[in-house]
């Protein structure tokens, strides 16, 4: 009837007003993709295909009235569903957006498809559901409408006076039937688009990580901060994080932790004046002396970090003296062990070792005592000329504050304790510490000198099997001739002392190849053969060594029967 036809035209016109054309751009400003979608909220939120947004840094939007705007924030995205929800700056009137239907429609349902029309008038098409499948709990339809990439992203409408979006058109990538029947267009139930909501877990989504347009934070403050926290620790695209920080602080200006996060973020990117401004803001919004103390301590830490990586480009006031003044202010408000630890690190870096030791000892007397604080104290006391036994006691405490079996952070204290154990004459302790040390560091970092040193200590400690093994490893870890000789000579001699004839002979033969017919090599060959009962070879090699002037070989020769 004329009335029904008029109603259909009105519905189609409303649908057309909700459509959006979208152009995405890469970082160089080149067009990355062109697609279409539709508005679903009065604030300009739209639904569109995901694929054209992958890698895009910005997107332009235009509607059926040729008004232009920008995609502002990505709300949520799902690459598998090829759907994305985003906000724009094109606010809509009540007749310029479409509600989503939660329903799953059966085979035979008729939808209306309203694409853009060249003359601005709606050109509606009918599309019947000919097949349904399930995709993550949502109907996935095959339609009677012809398959066309140009239709992807368009809404399929319910047959109602005030139509709702029943499904979103998607290109059918399947194979055409063998009987020549053309492929029908596909569509995903609109209920899938309604699941695209921002939440804290989404911050780690690889689908969102692949997008470079800023992300919309959750409205709840706690959930939004969790989202921001995860972005700060997972995102490499600093522009995304900077926008998220700005959005969060605009919505929650008195959030102290986020303000400190922002200060750290900008300090790490060498924007020190911005970091200082944020730290000053954090001070203003800190509710008590303890939290203000933490801000001063944070500033000191940022200054020291910056001095390490960017000392040539810092503001004049970002210097070590200012960091110490910040710690003074922190301590005057509420002293913390962490502040004392940082003070000790700064003083140690200045060569003020006694003062550094005092600061570290303050930490060690607190519940915050740790491997680091005791190890730092040991280093400071050592540089200050402290007693060796006192240094070892601190190293013992450091290692007592690490889990057993030891983890990688115990490697440095173990190496230090081995040095002091050797100095104090406790070679056995030194060897055991170096055995633990070897387990904690990558094999590539352990060269021949390490094993030579441990072998010599093991020999002094009468840990002979360890010594032989370490001499063997030292020889295997180097191509340098002199180092191999340095390892094989004591190995062969020790094996002779241990009556390990086969090992002694193998080492002596390798030594002979490296230093042909030298007295040491010849003598060790003779002794090795003597151990194995090879009297003729023993006499021959010892005779050759004696002939070359080795008096000890001559004496040994007289004992060979």
Please state what every model-predicted region is.
Residues 41-123, 136-140, 149:
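Conserved active-site neighborhood of the chymotrypsin/trypsin-like protease fold
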Residues 8-12, 167-232:
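C-terminal cap/linker of serine protease catalytic domains
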Residues 3-39, 45-49, 58, 216, ...:
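N-terminal activation segment of mature serine protease catalytic domains
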Residues 15-28, 89-96, 121-197:
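Active-site region of chymotrypsin-like
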Residues 257, 291-294, 336-338, 372, ...:
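Start-of-helix register in tetratricopeptide repeats
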Residues 268, 305-309, 349-350, 383-384, ...:
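Register position in tetratricopeptide repeats
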């Amino acid at each position: 009837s004329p009335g029904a036809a008029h109603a259909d035209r009105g519905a189609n016109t409303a649908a057309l007003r909700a459509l959006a054309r979208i152009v995405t751009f890469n970082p160089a400003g080149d067009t990355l993709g062109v697609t279409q979608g539709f508005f679903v909220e009065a604030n300009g939120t739209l639904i569109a295909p995901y694929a054209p947004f992958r890698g895009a840094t910005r997107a332009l939007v235009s509607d059926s009235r040729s008004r232009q705007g920008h995609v502002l924030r990505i709300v949520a995205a799902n690459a598998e569903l090829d759907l994305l929800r985003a906000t724009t700056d094109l606010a809509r009137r009540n007749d310029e957006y479409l509600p989503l239907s939660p329903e799953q429609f059966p085979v035979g349902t008729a939808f209306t498809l309203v694409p853009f029309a060249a003359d601005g008038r709606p050109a509606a098409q009918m599309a019947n559901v000919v097949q349904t499948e399930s995709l993550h709990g949502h109907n996935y339809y095959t339609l009677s409408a012809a398959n066309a990439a140009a239709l992807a992203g368009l809404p399929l409408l319910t047959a109602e006076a005030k139509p709702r979006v029943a499904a979103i058109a998607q290109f059918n990538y399947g194979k055409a039937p063998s009987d020549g029947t053309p492929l029908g267009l596909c569509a995903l139930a609109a209920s899938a688009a309604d699941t695209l909501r921002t939440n804290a877990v989404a911050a780690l989504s690889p689908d969102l990580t692949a997008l470079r347009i800023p992300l919309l934070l959750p409205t709840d403050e706690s959930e939004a901060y969790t989202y921001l926290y995860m972005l700060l620790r997972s995102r490499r695209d600093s522009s995304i994080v900077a926008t998220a920080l700005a959005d969060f602080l605009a919505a929650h200006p008195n959030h102290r932790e986020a303000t400190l996060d922002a200060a750290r973020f900008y300090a790490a990117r060498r924007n020190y004046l911005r970091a200082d401004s944020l730290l000053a803001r954090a001070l203003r919004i800190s509710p008590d002396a303890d939290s203000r103390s933490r801000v001063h301590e944070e500033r000191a830490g940022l200054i020291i970090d910056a001095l390490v990586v960017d000392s040539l480009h810092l503001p004049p006031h970002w210097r070590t003296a200012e960091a110490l003044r910040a710690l003074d202010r922190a301590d005057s408000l509420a002293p913390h062990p962490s502040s004392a630890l940082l003070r000790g690190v700064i003083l140690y870096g200045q060569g003020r070792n006694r003062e550094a030791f005092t600061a570290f000892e303050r930490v060690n007397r607190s519940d915050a005592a740790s491997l680091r604080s005791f190890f730092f104290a040991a280093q400071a006391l050592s540089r200050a000329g402290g007693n060796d036994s006192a240094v070892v006691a601190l190293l013992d405490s450091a290692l007592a504050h690490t889990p057993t079996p030891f983890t990688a952070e115990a490697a440095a204290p173990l190496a230090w304790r081995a040095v002091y154990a050797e100095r104090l004459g406790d070679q056995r302790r030194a060897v055991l510490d170096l055995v633990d040390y070897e387990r904690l560091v990558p094999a590539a970092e352990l060269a021949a000198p390490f094993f030579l040193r441990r072998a010599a200590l093991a020999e002094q400690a009468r840990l002979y099997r360890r010594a032989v093994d370490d001499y063997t490893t030292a020889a295997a870890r180097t191509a340098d001739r002199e180092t191999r000789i340095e390892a094989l000579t004591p190995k062969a001699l020790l094996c002779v002392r241990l009556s390990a004839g086969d090992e002694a002979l193998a080492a002596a033969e390798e030594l002979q190849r490296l230093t042909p017919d030298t007295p040491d090599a010849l003598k060790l060959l003779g002794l090795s053969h003597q151990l194995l009962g090879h009297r003729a070879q023993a006499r021959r090699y010892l005779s050759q060594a004696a002939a070359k002037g080795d008096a000890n070989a001559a004496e040994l020769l007289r004992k060979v029967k």
